[in-house]
Amino acid sequence: MRVLAAIALGATGLRGALAAVVPQEVLGTNPHIHHEQEKYLIELAPYQTRWVTEEEKWALKLDGVNFIDITEEHNTGFYPTLNSASYVKYPLKMQYADEVVALNKNLSTANMKANLEHFTSFHTRYYKSQTGIESATWLASQVEKVITESGAANHGATVERFAHPWGQFSIIARIPGQTNKTVVLGAHQDSINLFLPSILAAPGADDDGSGTVTILEALRGLLQSGSVAQGNATNTIEFHWYSAEEGGMLGSQAVFSSYKKNRREVKAMLQQDMTGYTKGALDAGAKEAVGIMIDYVDQGLTRFVKEIVTTYCSLGYVETKCGYACSDHTSASKYGYPAAMATESEMENTNRKIHTTDDQIKYLSFDHMLEHAKLTLGFAYELAFAPF
């Protein structure tokens, strides 16, 4: 997710530090090539592009500048849904309250805590690192376990390891419905320490370990529904854990680019990025709430997300803005798919320890994460049966 400009080390200092250190355990690099740094095409706003080095990418993030890296995907997206009226009609009120409330009772903070403790034990989940591959492998095994234990695998549910050239793969859990119309729930699995990405620890408990385990628990809860697990829902439901969000939404772009090329019909996408930190809001005298993005999102879908929070969560919501390219919903929008995003609070009160060694579990509220899991499950179930 976006980094706050309050991080102490400035971009200038980072450039010098990075230039002085040869990255360790970074996949796909050639230590014998020093004469010219590879450059990447980034987009700072729709159609506003710039060529930068990787070092300059991290400097921009340290300065609080969001971007999407379109080096491999330029000239492929067209942003038809940004800040526009939705072309998909979503339910005006909840249709399955009894079912969703019952399923939400099965959600467990203990499960999320146990999963996040293991997930943050990897030195870093940096997408070019060996431990980034190892963390993805562990996460995929947990997703597969949920699918298998629910019985959904016996009815066509699958877990795909979506390969990328940098090593760490994205993960897609697919629960087929009666149609191929698809609803996507997303989070990003990678972490980063912007000071020295390939060397320093990046536990990434909040960014986005919290979102990762939130939607994993929502998947487990959703599959307690026999109708969904047995493939009787109207629409197909997918849970995505993207690689390389921190590098500029690289993993999610590859996924949604593939979907567009294959004419996949995605009707809605909800991203959960940073779901566990409440201290910032409470210290500011604000109420604990679910943050709902209102910029660079599909407006109709965002209204629906607000209704989900109002109906199924114990907390209210607060509208907030994160600017362009702050998380993977940007990739869905880029390829014409309606997308929305939820986060832990208003952006000015979100976790300022992200992208450092201090993004740790001890600062998080699993009760707050539970509310995001309720949001995820309610969103998935209501739209699983929606007559698109």
UniProtKB/Swiss-Prot annotation:
Chain positions recorded as Zn(2+) 2 binding sites: 207, 246, 355
Needed cofactors: Zn(2+)
Biological process terms in GO annotation: proteolysis
Chain segments annotated as transmembrane: none
Enzyme class label: hydrolase
Superkingdom of origin organism: Eukaryota
Keyword Glycoprotein part of the UniProt annotation: yes
Family: Belongs to the peptidase M28 family. M28E subfamily.
Annotated organism of origin: Aspergillus clavatus (strain ATCC 1007 / CBS 513.65 / DSM 816 / NCTC 3887 / NRRL 1 / QM 1276 / 107)
EC number: 3.4.11.-
Function: Extracellular aminopeptidase that allows assimilation of proteinaceous substrates.
Gene name per UniProt: lap1
Disulphides: 322-326
Signal peptide: 1-19
Main localization category: secreted
Protein name: Leucine aminopeptidase 1
Cofactor binding, note field: Binds 2 Zn(2+) ions per subunit.
Annotated localization: Secreted
